[in-house]
Amino acid sequence: MIHTIPYFDAHCDTIHRCHTAGTPFRDPELRAFYDAAGDLRRSGGHIDLERAGGFSRYAQFFALYQSPRLVPEGSSMPEQGVLLHQRFLREMEENRERILPCRTGAEVDEAVGQGKAAALLSIEGAELLDCDIRRLDTAYDWGVRLLNPVWNYANRLSGSNAQQPEQGLTAYGRDFLQRMEELSIYVDVSHLSDAGFWDVVRLSRRPVVASH
């Protein structure tokens, strides 16, 4: 059975905030912002499961995201990606009576059919994969079905809306997009440069998402 889902949000940074909560930032406002996130069940952020429990049918893409400025010394963006994924899995396990991780439309239907929220995974900024085509297979195995090539910063795939907006997809970025499509990972054009956006529209054979 295919369910109509009236509440389907394509982007949130909740996992990032849960992962970063407890970091001893020197800036008290920054520390308070992240510490307020708590966990997925009850959060001071925009999304938590207690509030979402009021929705009849609800699906949510959770972004794996990290700001390069917040990567701890001695860590790396790919390592942060692993830790974020682990935090996502932990939240799914601790809240399995309310939410189920989903990889396919059929699994989304199954989750909402059980009266639970459906959780899907995205990656915001390919830096979490070191912009490495070979790491896309790992992301797919994690359950990632939506990916932003860039966040605020230009990278080896494309310029961003905030940095090098005239730079479209690089040759490597076009190869990266092709591999995403082979894996059935949708491209999210949010934060892309204007030139990169039009390159994606021209080259993509699958629907394109602008989540925010």
Regions found by a protein language model. Name each.
Residues I123, W151, V189-H191, H212:
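Short, structured patches in soluble enzyme cores that scaffold and shape functional sites
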Residues C131-D141, R145, A162-V209:
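Histidine/acidic residue-rich metal-binding segments in metalloenzymes
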